[in-house]
């Protein structure tokens, strides 16, 4: 990898969600909420960060988790362990072969009943969807894009490509909104999918969210066509499901730069970046910013999530 590349790190323990949560929990405090609800997989980085931030803000975290990989009761690991240490109220739901989003949609009646019960007891709940991908949350990444371009300018770097992982879509939507605010059409945004999505609707939903960010921010700009490229070919077997090629690039980055990525998000995104470079889809000599979204806690999760990364090599 060309050493002239740039890496924007958003911490290797926590993920990019802290950008969203800065805005979301400010909104929760403004509304006088004392409880935060959110949702995700059992090893969700978003859930762990939300629980952490809620505690920092004096609010009680309540989470519903879809068990894509079933945790062992006597061997709680990684993000789920941190959720437990934080004293989070945890409800684990069987996934039954469904995606996390599908699991949550099927159980929405449970969440609404729980929220209503707490309201009857005098509590006020702030409800954050999967990934924190709302117009308020995604605004954190509009700010991120503006900051990143300012840093590139101060470094004398014209950014040709900005590459990041994309799951619930809030990160990419925020980046697109930030690019629109700057009238920046010289930087190609690339999202590397980490879970299987409907290609016919996924990109358009991100555009709609980006426009909602712009509207919420009071900006005049709007996006009328896809301002990014999304690659779905690096998902592998699915969300939270590792594969050899991605794990090989996780090792490569760790062994050449001492930088850790995870097998769920940033590792698949980095593998996608490397493959785009190797195949010439990102031309030699390009200036590339890789937005490292953290999440290294996944390296300590269940074997089904990390794959062959735990094999000791001579």
Question: Language-model segments: what does each one mean?
Answer:
Residues 1-314:
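PLP-dependent amino-acid enzyme catalytic core
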């Amino acid at each position: 990898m060309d050493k002239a590349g740039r890496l924007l790190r958003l911490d290797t323990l926590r993920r990019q969600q802290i950008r969203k949560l800065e805005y979301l929990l400010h909104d929760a405090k403004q509304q006088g909420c004392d409880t935060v609800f959110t949702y995700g997989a059992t090893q969700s980085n978003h859930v762990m960060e939300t629980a952490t931030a809620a505690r920092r803000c004096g609010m009680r975290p309540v989470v519903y988790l879809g068990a894509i990989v079933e945790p062992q009761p006597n061997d709680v690991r990684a993000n789920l362990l941190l959720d437990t240490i934080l004293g989070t109220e945890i409800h684990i739901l069987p996934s039954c072969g469904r995606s996390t989003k599908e699991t949550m949609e099927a159980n929405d009646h449970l969440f609404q009943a729980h929220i209503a019960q707490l309201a009857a007891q005098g509590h006020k709940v702030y409800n954050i969807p999967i990934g924190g991908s709302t117009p308020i949350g995604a605004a954190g990444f509009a700010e991120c894009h503006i900051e990143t371009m300012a840093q590139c300018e101060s470094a004398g770097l014209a950014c040709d490509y900005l590459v990041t992982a994309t799951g619930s879509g809030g990160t990419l939507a925020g980046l697109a909104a930030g690019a629109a605010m700057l009238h920046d059409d010289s930087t190609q945004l690339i999202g590397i999918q980490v879970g299987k999505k409907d290609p016919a609707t996924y990109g358009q939903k991100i555009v709609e969210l980006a426009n909602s960010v712009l509207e919420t921010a009071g900006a005049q700009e709007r996006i009328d066509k896809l301002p990014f490229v999304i690659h779905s070919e690096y998902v592998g077997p699915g969300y939270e499901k590792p594969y050899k090629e991605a794990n090989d690039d996780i090792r490569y980055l760790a062994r050449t730069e001492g930088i850790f990525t995870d097998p769920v998000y940033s590792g698949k995104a980095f593998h996608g970046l490397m493959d785009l470079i190797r195949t010439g889809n990102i031309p030699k000599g390009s200036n590339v910013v890789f937005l490292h979204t953290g999440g290294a806690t996944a390296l300590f999760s269940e074997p089904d999530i990390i794959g062959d990364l735990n094999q000791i090599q001579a």
